C-alpha cells in the first residue's frame, strides 16, 4: 500500500481512548456513505495537497485531470479506501483493538520508509475531513467521532514516522 493507505490515518484508533460503540457507529455509517467513491476521495486529497500526489511515483508531476480516470488511479484509490474500510469496520469493539493497532502501526512503518511526514498525514486528515463534511450528513457528533478516531490513529502512526 502506498502513502495513501495513509487513509488509514483516517481511521479509527483503539488505543488511548477507544471509540465507544456509538462513536464507531457514526464513523462507520458516514464512511459507508462515501466509501464507494474511491476515485473521488483520492482526487480530493490530491487536489487539496499536490505534495501528497507527488509522493506517488506513478502520479508525480502529472495533471490530476489526466490521471483521475485511469485504471492505475482507480486501483490505487481502491487500495487506500479498502484499507480504511478494514480499520473502520474493526472499530468500536474492544476485542479488535490489537488488530487495529497492528494495522495502523504497519501503516506508520510503511510510510516512514517512504519518507512521509507527520505534516503530510495532517494534510491527508484535513482533506479527508473536508471531503466527508461535503458528502455526508455532518454534525457535531459525527465531527467529534471522526476527530477521536483520527486522534487515536495519529497517536499510533506519528511516533513511528
Curated annotation (Swiss-Prot):
PANTHER family xrefs = GLOBIN-LIKE PROTEIN
Q: What family does the entry list?
A: Belongs to the globin family.
Question: What's this protein's name?
Answer: Globin CTT-VIIB-6
- Keyword Metal-binding (UniProt): yes
Coiled-coil annotation: which residues? none
* Gene Ontology CC terms: extracellular region; hemoglobin complex
> Which residues does the UniProt record annotate as the domain Globin?
18-161
Which cysteines share a disulfide bond? none
Q: Which SUPFAM superfamilies match?
A: Globin-like (SSF46458)
| Keyword Transmembrane helix recorded | no
The GO terms this record gives for MF are: heme binding; metal ion binding; oxygen binding; oxygen carrier activity
Q: Which organism is it from?
A: Chironomus thummi thummi
Key words, A-Z: Heme, Iron, Metal-binding, Oxygen transport, Signal, Transport
Spell out the note in the miscellaneous section.
Answer: There are at least 12 different components in Midge globin.
Signal sequence residues = 1-16
